[in-house]
Amino acid sequence: MTKTVFVLITDWAYYNKAITTIRDLRTVGCWNGEIVLITIDFNLDENIKNDLKLTEMKFPSINKSNLLEKIGPNGFSNSDKREIHKLNQWEKLHVFDDYFLKWDRVAYLDAGLRVLDNVQYLLELDCQNKILAPNDASPNFRPDQIFKYQISYDNEEMVHLVKSDFGVDIFEKHHMLNCMWLYDTSILKICNKEQLIEAMNKYTLCKTNEMGIMNLLFHFKNNLWEEFPLKASNGKYLFEWCELNHSHHTTWRDYCFIKYPVTIRLEDRPLL
């Protein structure tokens, strides 16, 4: 039997959002298995831990001093400044720590992402020797949804380094979105947290922080990414960033997972 764990990571600012996602998992998601919650700057309440059957995990904070020194205090000229203001996003790389080799598969969800149907529709996907994640360009595939728009061009030497190490073709390719993913832990033998952190400090031009590095290593270097199917086997959309991405009317009931839903509030419980 395949051993699977769901993983979330949160700081105190996103704690309530994380709990919403976990409650979704336990109720509408029908997940009775293991959930690991990585906490950053607080300790999880024992009552919550017991009530939701959570394993709390802590890792040493990823050192970002070298990264910040290379980026500079003002950040990139073409970004929303998350590279200097949303540094906890890099802590998501802990989800590729060798600690997770005790499971066969790891399913990661961002704090606040809504689980709107049974997780079986995610877990029935074949992720053997792969990482599955949404295509950032889906469903509309606009011309600006390719990798060249994910990086800063402020440092010409850094851009040249990426082209030299990964080829120029990657700039025109689609890339994974990393608010949720499912991976086979065998890929940690190819690329794990240590390599990702090394790349973080080497390729310091990613406007989307850890998402850019995950694409460079899992997708472009090691060819491990496979995109989610648009529809799950139940006929619903497997994942969407927001219902408004579709030109036709949909509601949360048409999806299995949504990052930022507008037809259901964070405090609402999905009732199918």
Identify the residue ranges that each predicted region occupies.
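Short internal beta-strands
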Residues: 34-41, 133-135
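A glycosyltransferase accessory/donor-loop signature
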Residues: 1-4, 8, 14-20, 37, ...
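Short, polar loop motifs at secondary-structure junctions
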Residues: 39-45, 115-119, 231-233
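GT-A fold catalytic core of metal-dependent nucleotide-sugar glycosyltransferases
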Residues: 88-146, 183
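Charged, glycine/proline-rich intrinsically disordered loops and linkers
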Residues: 62-84, 142-168
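Short, acidic, metal-binding catalytic loop of nucleotide-sugar glycosyltransferases
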Residues: 24-32
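Active-site-proximal specificity loops/subdomain of glycosyltransferases
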Residues: 46-100
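Short, charged/polar "capping" segments at the starts of alpha-helices
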Residues: 15-16, 41-48, 141-142
